[in-house]
């Protein structure tokens, strides 16, 4: 036994030298980037795996990476950093809005400050559509005339564009609104350049619409920009219950979308017709300066349970304060009465609307199509003025936000909170007095018309989160 002891010690030493490094040593290694590519890989504005437009997402693969890591974008004489996120497609990061166009190095750093190897990408500035923004209250050409909405293309004339064009021609339809995306991750393949080209060949405008939730506004804006890049003649934002209370998200979405497409591209909003009933929805952001130029409230009188006249009047009264041209979305689904469809067309023509559209192609029966094919019968007399929202102390909601954004320029003591508080009440009374109006503390027609002449004071909703 004594003679064999040195041999055993030597073997133990060799085993020690050959043993793998402990896990703690591996953790001390810096992160490693192995691949960068666009999200989604088929995106129009992400033309290759290493060429991406500012504001787009990138998917990052590598070793020792995790959610929350610092991601740096570096170029000569500049750098920006953001955080790595994890989604269903893996680890993703969005190219910051102020990144310089050109060749950029991307690295990630862990909590200890260890930096990965650099991967080079090419960053493009977002394309801009030239021309000045239209005058407030002017309906862009893309929304003029009659339109029909398509939810599922395959269930609308079985997706046959020639049949769609024939039906549209017979019904006087000039614009087709086709769903292009849902949320920030679901791009609908039915809206594509081939469809746009085919509709154009038949003399139809092809507009895209996207349903938004506000959970990932930058991704939703990117998908909207994708539809525009596919050739859409206009884009409509469909924001409903899911967007209530999400002012910061709405501002992020609009800012990102306009940064990509410019101020002139025609954008519309479709949502609930009764602003006071959905008081937490950020109409004032979607319809405010630099945002949508067309307001397409969903005036579904049969579903709402009122007459065409009553529902239309309340819709106009509730929405007119935003100063955005109104092109209402009417109801041809649910066996809508052809006489109601005719009345709706005549009434809104009397209100001066230059555009109407209908929901939806796949749910419209033959009697409704026949009603659309008839000429509009003018009203014997102009419709009565529907009035204006009467706001007073204690009221809450987006209409109060809009009022406060105007009054804040008259009286800096007014805070934009959405609550008609004592400061708002006093400012309104002082304003009424200064304009020679009846001092009531309530927004009647004359008060609204005077208040809306004040400049809109901007609000940074993103800083309030």
Briefly describe each language-model feature range.
Residues 232-243, 279-308, 359-363:
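Aromatic- and acid-rich polysaccharide-binding/catalytic face
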Residues 391-451:
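Short acidic, glycine/serine/threonine-rich helix-capping segments at coil-helix boundaries
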Residues 25-69, 103-105, 114-130:
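Beta-strand/beta-sandwich contexts
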């Amino acid at each position: 036994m004594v003679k064999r002891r040195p041999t055993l010690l030597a073997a133990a030493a060799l085993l020690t030298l050959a043993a793998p490094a402990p896990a703690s040593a591996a953790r001390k290694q810096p992160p490693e980037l192995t691949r960068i590519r666009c999200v989604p890989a088929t995106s129009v504005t992400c033309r290759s795996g290493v060429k991406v437009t500012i504001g787009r997402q990138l998917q990052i693969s590598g070793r020792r990476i995790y959610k929350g890591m610092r991601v740096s974008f570096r170029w000569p004489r500049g750098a920006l950093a953001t955080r790595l996120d994890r989604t269903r497609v893996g680890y993703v990061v969005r190219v910051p809005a102020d990144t310089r166009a050109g060749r950029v190095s991307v690295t990630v750093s862990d909590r200890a400050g260890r930096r990965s190897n650099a991967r080079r990408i090419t960053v493009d500035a977002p394309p801009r559509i030239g021309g000045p923004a239209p005058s407030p209250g002017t309906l862009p050409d893309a929304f003029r005339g009659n339109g029909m909405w398509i939810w599922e293309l395959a269930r609308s004339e079985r997706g046959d564009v020639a049949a769609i064009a024939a039906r549209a021609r017979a019904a006087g339809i000039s614009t087709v609104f086709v769903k292009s995306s849902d949320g920030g991750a679901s791009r609908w393949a039915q809206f594509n350049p081939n469809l746009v080209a085919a509709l154009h060949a038949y003399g139809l405008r092809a507009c895209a619409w996207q349903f938004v939730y506000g959970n990932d506004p930058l991704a939703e804006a990117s998908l909207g920009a994708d539809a525009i890049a596919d050739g859409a003649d206009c884009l409509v934002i469909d924001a409903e219950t899911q967007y209530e209370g999400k002012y910061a998200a709405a501002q992020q979405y609009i800012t990102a979308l306009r940064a990509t497409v410019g101020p002139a591209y025609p954008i519309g909003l479709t949502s609930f017709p009764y602003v006071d009933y959905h008081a937490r929805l950020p109409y004032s952001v979607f319809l405010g300066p630099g945002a949508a130029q067309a307001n397409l409230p969903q005036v579904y009188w049969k579903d709402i349970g009122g007459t065409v006249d009553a529902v239309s009047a309340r819709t106009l009264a509730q929405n007119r304060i935003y100063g955005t041209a109104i092109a209402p979305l009417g109801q041809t689904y649910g066996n809508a009465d052809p006489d109601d469809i005719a009345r709706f067309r005549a009434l809104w023509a009397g209100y001066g609307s230059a555009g109407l559209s209908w929901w939806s192609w796949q749910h419209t029966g033959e009697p409704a199509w026949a009603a659309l094919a008839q000429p509009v019968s003018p009203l014997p007399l102009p419709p009565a003025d529907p009035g204006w929202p009467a706001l007073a102390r204690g009221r809450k909601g987006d209409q109060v936000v809009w009022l406060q954004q105007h009054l804040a320029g008259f009286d800096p003591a007014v805070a934009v909170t959405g609550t008609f508080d004592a400061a708002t009440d006093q400012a309104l009374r002082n304003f009424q007095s200064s304009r020679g109006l009846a001092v009531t503390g309530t927004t009647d027609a004359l008060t609204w018309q005077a208040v809306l002449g004040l400049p809109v004071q901007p609000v940074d909703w993103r800083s309030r989160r």
